[in-house]
Amino acid sequence: MIRNESIICFAHDWKGDPTSKTHIMRILSEKNRILWVNSIGMRRPSVSGRDARRLAAKGRQLIQGLVRVNANLHVASPLAVPLPGVPGIDRLNTLLLTASIRHFARRAGLTRPILWTFLPNTVGLVGRLGESRVIYHCVDEYSAFAGVPRDALRAMEEALVRRADLVLASSETLAQERRRFNPRTHFVSHGVDVAHFAQALSPTLAPPRETMGLPRPIIGFFGLIAEWIDLDLIAEIARRRPDWTMLMIGKANVDTGVLRGQPNVHLLGQKPYATLPAYCRSFDVGIIPFRVDALTVRANPLKLREYLAAGLPVVSSDLPEVRKYAGLARVAHGVDGFVAAIETALAEDGQAARSARVAAMAPESWEARVEQISDLIDDTGVRA
């Protein structure tokens, strides 16, 4: 692992469930100084209650200033106007962000930092923070999200890819597309906290009380219930197999009404990351019911490896990154395909198969991913 580096990381807000970004930076903070910059926003807020709550949370973050997570990791919430893609506003934000981030970096003790960004709209900050190198870490096709300024984001991302010293991409498709603009682009898959999710196999771990009385088998999902989740598919599976329990865990930011009329669908809401192994212990199969579109064909679902590290059989929509796990996960097409694949997964499951899935995830830890990334960073030059 790289050591004694200063890193300014631009990503989503630190608070919340761990993601690839938080896993990587938490590990790096063991030997390096990290300034994590909370999200500066990639879309304009709407008049929705969700956006109003988010703006209020941003206001509270601004008041907090620099927040210490551990001795080497601090979180900053700089001031920015949430109107991305507007030229005058983008220039203003660049000035505001440059001044505030330089201030926070000094307070956190950073010198000659690596600028490590997960966000295309930070391209205007390249060259302004005294950085030693620039890393663009692409984990999604951002222009495919709903409500974003697509053309502006594509232009920002292309400029960022061209200027980066190193580009990391979490799927082969993302890497191939960005390599057209920068040959220093590398595919680095997501990792998994194997020890955490493997707790699901422990006989001493009790399943959550709210799942104990549910009829088996339990077909489970955890994660954000968002635009890329095929709710119609889930509802139809539930109708076809009323003897199955469809258990959905996660915050929903879309209308889930199509599921609420199904007596065998249970929406439990968001649960703490620490409790997910216990919920996995209740699952008989883990599903990844994604819509197949421009966003998801470039995705590499974290939950794939998390389900497998919990020993679960997995049935997923047909995504390129899932296909690589043939023998560990099944891909399915449509309602008929999902029902048949789940039936097969249930019939072929057993303790030996669950242990084998956990063992297969051992080389895919977040620590291993950080070592892989560190080797790539060591191969890049330091900016003059």
Residue spans of the language-model regions?
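Carbohydrate-associated surface elements
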Residues: 173, 188-200
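Conserved donor-binding/catalytic core segment of Leloir-type glycosyltransferases
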Residues: 211-229, 234-238, 362
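Nucleotide-sugar-dependent
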Residues: 229, 274-279, 286-309, 316-327
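A charged, aromatic-enriched C-terminal amphipathic alpha-helix characteristic of glycosyltransferases
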Residues: 350-377
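Nucleotide-sugar donor-binding and catalytic loop/hinge architecture
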Residues: 1-3, 201-218
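Membrane-proximal helix-turn-helix segments that form the acceptor-binding/catalytic region
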Residues: 99-106, 127, 149-167
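Nucleotide-activated donor-binding/catalytic signature segment of Leloir-type glycosyltransferases, i.e.
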Residues: 255-280
